[in-house]
């Protein structure tokens, strides 16, 4: 079975989301609901399939298919870079890193020593080397689940490091990527120059998703018995985000309640954690999984986590400005909790 990729802007249509309250979304229904924002696919988008280049989904987890139609032991990755992941045994996943001093290895070492942060991430089992490569050894978050539903939600209003946008050089390649997605986005001056800065492009990119407005964006999901859908980054409006999450939860009251409690727990631990007080957390995801018997949610992917200078204080909620290092991860958790609360209330009233 192959992973499904959708390389174009899309949105949910409200009309096609009008299922009965007991309906649960499946892969075919998702495909039917995905449409272009302007109801036709532009040739420039066809030729620029990676124009948005939203950073890769974070899930360092492989999905072991347990469907009868799929050979036993077949592995599929929900999202991310498949070449960086190696399935292990006994509930362990290996994630390839650059070396023992890789930024993510440093982050996990710090998190493992924090009484609060360590409760909301995959268990860190150490760093190992094999055949010249270096790997993180992490808890396989899907171990023990059977044919689960999975969602990857990238957190934060800013999903790029400040160091990535310091260069003010005007770039024609980023201008071309911008107009491939949104031809009217550049200003008259930018059209004249046929170039934009990387900061301008990155901010545009965040606005194309729900990252800027909600502090999170849905990267990918997989429903029970279906292949992953790995390009939902432009699901943006309040209604579309709400409906996507609601359909993912299949109106399962107990699942929604347990996940809501876990999200609140994650928020509380972040607020108490010394690690989070001293680090910006950029590009991390909340990884949600449930099956018929269990639920789980963890914060994953710390490749872009950076320790702050001693004089820098952040609250993870304030609006980002260059130099303040705010990334908005707690703002996003607040928004996500609010949506889960609304879904829970709706489920209880029906």
Where are these regions (language model features)?
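Polybasic, positively charged surfaces/segments
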Residues: 2-350
